[in-house]
């Protein structure tokens, strides 16, 4: 196998995303009659990005966006007081910070002076909540008088305020207005409802200039909130269970980028929203492991190598490298045994192969090998 070094290092922009899972225990009442309750008992909010977006145009993704200085501002301290405050804001002991790569470089904002700002795990949660409001009109807020800490069960989103469109326009233009909206509603971002789930870094690909270091949080709601796409970054949405999203992807109704497909398949492990919520609470102290996929180009496809795979090289050269081989994907698969990889045959056909054990009390997807009829 060979690699090709790209001149000049990339930098990742820090970002946060919410995987929003909502209970769905009874049939919908829409006319004409729509889908029955999903087998999993919950559905995920998938937002369709505008085809005019520069990054992943047209993809169905989880809500999220780039961390802004306003998300870390010390101005939030007054809103969280007196019930919630430094050092942990009721989030419990600090989780471990883990990385599966030995020498990840600093992100753009590490060189700024963050003295007096909020802890990172608070700021990332505020960012994720703000983006859910901007993109989907979903308000994950909690009254200021509520006790801190995670709720024993899934919660509810706040009803949209009067003047939703006006508030959203202001927040989109200046994220500092999100603090003002929260103060107006006498609420705080419900950072306690966001559970550590995963963290993905954009791998190196030729022609790709945008790279992100994204923390994914899982939020469980008892029922789906109303969704109002902003019709700018987001042009549509759907609620889909893991099995429904997989089938929509394979039938080319939607396109899921590899990280989203992996997470959808990971969530297929859970039989109910209650099981998922309990699982999140049970691994709250394990933190997020940051994964940097390494791309292996084969003669007839592409393999996203993930930590633990026997071909995954924890070498800083691959921060800016592709791996390549003249062998076909099938040959590569026959040669190995220790797999943690996403095999991409084309835009709407991925296989997931996992033979390694999960770490840090997490779960990995089960092997997901598509029927040959899709080829």
Curated annotation (Swiss-Prot):
Motif annotated as Nudix box, chain positions: 116-137
Known cofactor(s): Mg(2+); Mn(2+)
Residues carrying the site annotation Important for coenzyme A binding: 49, 55, 210
Biological process terms in GO annotation: butyryl-CoA catabolic process; coenzyme A catabolic process; fatty acid catabolic process; malonyl-CoA catabolic process; medium-chain fatty-acyl-CoA catabolic process; propionyl-CoA metabolic process; succinyl-CoA catabolic process
Matches recorded under InterPro entries: NUDIX_hydrolase-like_dom_sf (IPR015797), NUDIX_hydrolase_dom (IPR000086), NUDT19 (IPR039121)
Single GO MF annotation: coenzyme A diphosphatase activity
Ligand binding (Mg(2+)): 131, 135
Domain Nudix hydrolase stretches: 15-263
Catalytic reaction equation(s): an acyl-CoA + H2O = an acyl-4'-phosphopantetheine + adenosine 3',5'-bisphosphate + 2 H(+); CoA + H2O = (R)-4'-phosphopantetheine + adenosine 3',5'-bisphosphate + 2 H(+); hexanoyl-CoA + H2O = hexanoyl-4'-phosphopantetheine + adenosine 3',5'-bisphosphate + 2 H(+); octanoyl-CoA + H2O = S-octanoyl-4'-phosphopantetheine + adenosine 3',5'-bisphosphate + 2 H(+)
Major localisation: other
Record family assignment: Belongs to the Nudix hydrolase family.
Biological role: Fatty acyl-coenzyme A (CoA) diphosphatase that hydrolyzes fatty acyl-CoA to yield acyl-4'-phosphopantetheine and adenosine 3',5'-bisphosphate. Mediates the hydrolysis of a wide range of CoA esters, including choloyl-CoA and branched-chain fatty-acyl-CoA esters and at low substrate concentrations medium and long-chain fatty-acyl-CoA esters are the primary substrates. Highest activity seen with medium-chain acyl-CoA esters and higher rates of activity seen with the unsaturated acyl-CoA esters compared with the saturated esters. Exhibits decapping activity towards dpCoA-capped RNAs in vitro.
UniProt protein name: Acyl-coenzyme A diphosphatase NUDT19
């Amino acid at each position: 196998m060979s690699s090709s070094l790209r001149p000049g290092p990339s930098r990742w922009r820090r970002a946060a995303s919410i995987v929003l899972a909502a209970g769905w225990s009874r049939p919908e009442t829409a006319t004409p009659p729509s889908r029955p309750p999903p087998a999993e008992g919950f559905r995920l909010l998938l937002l369709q990005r505008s085809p005019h977006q520069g990054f992943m145009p047209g993809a169905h993704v989880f809500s999220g966006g780039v961390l802004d200085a306003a998300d870390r501002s010390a101005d939030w301290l007054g809103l969280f007081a007196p019930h919630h405050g430094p050092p942990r804001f009721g989030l419990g002991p600090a989780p471990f910070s883990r990385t599966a790569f030995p020498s990840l470089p600093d992100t753009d904002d590490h060189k700024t002076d963050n003295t007096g700002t909020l802890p990172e795990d608070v700021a990332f949660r505020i960012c994720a909540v703000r983006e859910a409001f901007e993109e989907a009109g979903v308000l994950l807020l909690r009254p200021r008088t509520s006790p801190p800490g995670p709720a024993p069960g899934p919660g509810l989103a706040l009803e949209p305020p009067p003047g939703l469109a006006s508030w959203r326009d202001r927040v989109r233009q200046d994220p500092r207005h999100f603090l003002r909206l929260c103060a107006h509603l006498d609420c705080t971002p419900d950072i306690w409802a966001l559970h550590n789930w995963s963290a993905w870094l954009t791998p190196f690909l030729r022609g790709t200039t945008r790279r992100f270091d994204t923390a994914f949080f899982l939020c469980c709601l008892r029922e789906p909130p109303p969704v109002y796409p902003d019709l700018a970054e987001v042009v549509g949405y759907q609620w889909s269970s893991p099995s429904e999203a997989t089938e929509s992807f394979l039938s080319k109704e939607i396109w899921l980028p590899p990280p989203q497909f992996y997470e959808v398949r990971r969530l297929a492990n859970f039989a109910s929203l209650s099981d998922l919520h309990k699982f999140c609470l049970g691994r709250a102290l394990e933190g997020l492991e940051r994964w940097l996929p390494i791309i292996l180009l084969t003669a007839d496809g592409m393999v996203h190598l993930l930590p633990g795979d026997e071909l995954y090289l924890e070498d800083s050269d691959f921060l800016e490298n592709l791996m390549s081989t003249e062998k076909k994907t099938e040959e590569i698969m026959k040669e190995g045994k220790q797999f943690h990889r996403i095999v991409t045959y084309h835009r709407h056909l991925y296989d997931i192969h996992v033979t390694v054990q999960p770490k840090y009390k997490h779960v990995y997807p089960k092997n997901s090998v598509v029927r040959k009829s899709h080829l």
